[in-house]
């Protein structure tokens, strides 16, 4: 494994991005590919940085809060099939944009490129996305973005996740034929890790940390995604025009009939 160089500034960024950073434990992978599950807390980012340097840490993962305190809602999408780096990043940007449209900017804390072949979208702590939300609640919400076997544009409801993926495809693949839209929507549909989203006991990669598989540090892409949305939809985020993400009253058995926006069920 290649040696990665953490700086105090990098660890400060990690520290500031982690809620309850001094009240939760961490898991560390060393440059020798050994996991350390530290049974301790860190009071400051300086303490965390010192530990990382002393133990030659590569990857940093955040654990749930102790005593069943829960964990953030995180969408973890990973793309195993891609042609090249450009194709991978296109899939990442389309998938992450679909979730931004689905959950809306007001509910998204940050979107991180993982440093390898996917993205993590962290949701904000709200009444809809409580850190203490039980697993069955998360499983129910996960069903909204399970990939269907096939799509028919005539039966996709505004506000559904399928609609959001389709709009994201339109945004990033502007010169496609409408006849290819359903196939492209399925092609770019993000593959979400069910265990990470639903299992409150799973650890998650710390924002801005190093990813030994991709040999890169993770980076925040939220601004890039929002800038693209606002450039193409000038009213996005201000109540103006843009992709429809309001709740509709669907008629079974249309696709998306159980997939409304965060303003109603998520």
From Swiss-Prot:
Keywords assigned by UniProt, alphabetized: Early protein, Transcription, Transcription regulation, Transferase
Record GO terms (molecular function): DNA binding; DNA-directed RNA polymerase activity
Positions of region (Disordered): 244-266
Polar residues bias (residue ranges): 257-266
Protein EC: 2.7.7.-
GO biological processes: viral genome replication
Family: Belongs to the baculoviridae LEF-1 family.
Task of the protein: Plays an essential role in viral DNA replication. May generates single-stranded DNA for both leading and lagging strand synthesis. The primase initiates primer synthesis and thereby produces large amount of short RNA primers on the lagging strand that the polymerase elongates using dNTPs.
The name this protein goes by in its record: DNA primase
Organism the protein comes from: Autographa californica nuclear polyhedrosis virus (AcMNPV)
Source taxonomy: Viruses, Viruses incertae sedis, Naldaviricetes, Lefavirales, Baculoviridae
Gene from which this protein is expressed: LEF-1
